[in-house]
């Protein structure tokens, strides 16, 4: 164990500017607090078990009842010991996942009072309790068999029994999904979506992109990222993939994309006409609009405007020709 002098010689977070060193110091502080918390927890459990054991010895004189009470206390203490060990492993895993690598050292070094927790306050284990532990496939020094037995215990005191097996089952299901072929994976996802109350994948995606979620929720933050960053790539992949679809499959998609483009184009022209052009729009205003759109959109708009300009000139020529023919048919 580290001496008091060497501990006080360690620098504090305020004395270090390197982020890695600051994380190491923060890790050491978290380890110290966790060890203190676990030590207090162990002392409370040992005191509680001692009191219960003494009370049972004073009030019960029958040998059979004493053995059953002692077996219950041993099993209770053993279960609480494993629950505390699970808490310790959960905290270590969470700190290690956050980049605090020094937590891994705690797994290698023995923690205080680890052996004492296997017995009740130093009392010799009864044959009943020893055989019970052996039936469970556990021993004092066998950590591998103990870790296998953790699946039958709850993670924290007061939690529902079987929460850890549920987590392991979820991990296995996720691994199975990753190993599936695309057809089976999509079938599983579609079934989950339908079980959640959605008619199909399209209704699910529509609600994801259109629905107004609570601004403080996690799904709202993910939705904003999808709208602002990932939707463009999604539409691009959809446009490229639609080229290989049949005409029947691509018809509705192309029609809706055309409507969207027309709506966006009309809105932009309306905004431009109200802010730049006056009521008497002329060819100069049209030329100005042409230059703006050419610089912002590109050659597609240029070709479109040329076509519109030629159509307008043709209509003007037809109107002029009609008027000349009306007033002087002989010249025509």
Curated annotation (Swiss-Prot):
Domain of life from the UniProt record: Eukaryota
Description of the deletion phenotype: Impairs the expression of the zearalenone biosynthesis cluster genes and results in the loss of beta-zearalenonol and zearalenone production.
Reported induction: Conditions for carbon-, nitrogen-, or phosphorus-starvations lead to very low expression. Increase in pH results in gradual reduction of the gene expression.
GO molecular function, a single term: transcription regulator activator activity
GO CC list: nucleus
Location of the bZIP domain: 17-50
One record GO biological process: zearalenone biosynthetic process
Predominant localisation class: nucleus
Localization of this protein: Nucleus
Biased composition range(s): Low complexity: 143-155
Keywords per UniProt: Nucleus, Transcription, Transcription regulation
UniProt-annotated stretches for the region Basic motif: 21-43
Bias kind Polar residues: ranges: 111-134, 160-170
Extent of Basic and acidic residues compositional bias: 14-24
Region Disordered, annotated ranges: 1-37, 106-170
Annotated region described as Leucine-zipper, given as residue ranges: 45-52
Function: Transcription factor that specifically controls transcription of the zearalenone biosynthesis cluster genes.
Family in the record: Belongs to the bZIP family.
Protein name: Transcription factor ZEB2
Gene field: ZEB2
